[in-house]
A protein has these predicted regions:
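A short, conserved, highly charged catalytic patch centered on acidic carboxylates
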Residues: 1-128, 136-173
Length: 174
């Protein structure tokens, strides 16, 4: 097709991304990630280390309700004194069943944070999931089944902006 003939590849400078420059480098290239794993590794992982109360966060967290696995959340991070699940997408507008997926991470009895560590119900936010895509950051409220826009990532230019976002999120958690 003609549009392919006229297109040009733009190399992503992934090798240049590190803990000191990730936000500056990815700000320009963030929307060009074509794989969720790229977006996670080169943006979200750094983002969560700043957003959370501790740098440690967990990936691929199995959620359980009544002894049955309900789903696997992309991440769990500590915020507001408890673990909160984070779902990562390239574009939430291409996810027709996103709300159903997010509900699987709510009202859970426990989560396997990794192979050795788990968190019980009282250490988990029960009705809240954070959602990030290459454009925006959202808060999912399971009680109202609403996905609430919090921030356009173009407005997140410094780590201080992320810390300010944390303070906006904490009162919403339930």
């Amino acid at each position: 097709p003609q549009y392919l003939k006229e297109s040009r590849a733009i190399p992503l400078p992934l090798k240049k991304i590190n803990a000191k420059n990730w936000l500056e480098v990815t700000q320009h290239y963030r929307r060009l990630f074509t794989l969720e794993i790229q977006f996670r590794r080169f943006y979200v992982d750094y983002f969560l280390k700043v957003l959370g109360e501790q740098k440690k966060f967990y990936a691929e967290c199995e959620c359980y309700r009544q002894g049955q696995r309900t789903g696997i959340a992309d991440n769990a991070m500590k915020i507001g004194g408890r673990w909160c699940f984070v779902e990562v997408k390239l574009n939430i507008h291409t996810e027709p069943h996103l709300h159903n997926q997010l509900k699987k991470y709510c009202q859970v009895e426990k989560t396997a944070l990794d192979k050795e560590r788990s968190a019980e119900q009282e250490k988990l936010w029960q009705n809240s999931v954070l959602v990030i895509d290459t454009t925006d950051f959202y808060f999912y409220d399971a009680l109202t089944d609403n996905l609430i826009f919090l921030k356009n990532l173009d407005e997140v230019c410094t780590e201080e902006d992320i810390k300010t976002l944390r303070e906006k999120i904490i009162p919403l958690l339930q």
